[in-house]
């Protein structure tokens, strides 16, 4: 059996998952990152995408996250998401509302903030294409 570690996915609204995991794939801003037991200590920012968790009991859980930070230690990983939802609970309306909110914020934005919001909208659009069937 593979080594396991403690994983927690937390959003401002609630604790979404606290489990013993064998592998977690995180959509880090530098690219997808796979976390396993005894991982080197790392902190990374998280972009909108899908977090895939393989639990120690063999289940696979998928969550859509909308940005955040991951704190990775050899004994565990905590992902603090700006917002997150289980993929099974994500629907087109939720995603379209998030995109509309970002577009509204884009109207008054300039320079670097405008670029960040445009990138966020692109990431949300891609996320929708990945997890929501047409």
Curated annotation (Swiss-Prot):
Topology with respect to the bilayer: Peripheral membrane protein
Gene3D superfamilies linked to this entry: F0F1 ATP synthase delta/epsilon subunit, N-terminal
Pfam family, one: ATP-synt_DE_N
SUPFAM superfamilies: Epsilon subunit of F1F0-ATP synthase N-terminal domain (SSF51344)
Localization per record: Cell inner membrane
Gene Ontology CC terms: plasma membrane; proton-transporting ATP synthase complex
Chief localization: membrane
Protein's job: Produces ATP from ADP in the presence of a proton gradient across the membrane.
Subunit record text: F-type ATPases have 2 components, CF(1) - the catalytic core - and CF(0) - the membrane proton channel. CF(1) has five subunits: alpha(3), beta(3), gamma(1), delta(1), epsilon(1). CF(0) has three main subunits: a, b and c.
Entry's family note: Belongs to the ATPase epsilon chain family.
Stated name of the protein: ATP synthase epsilon chain
Organism, scientific name: Sinorhizobium fredii (strain NBRC 101917 / NGR234)
Source taxonomy: Bacteria, Pseudomonadati, Pseudomonadota, Alphaproteobacteria, Hyphomicrobiales
Name of the gene encoding the protein in the UniProt record: atpC
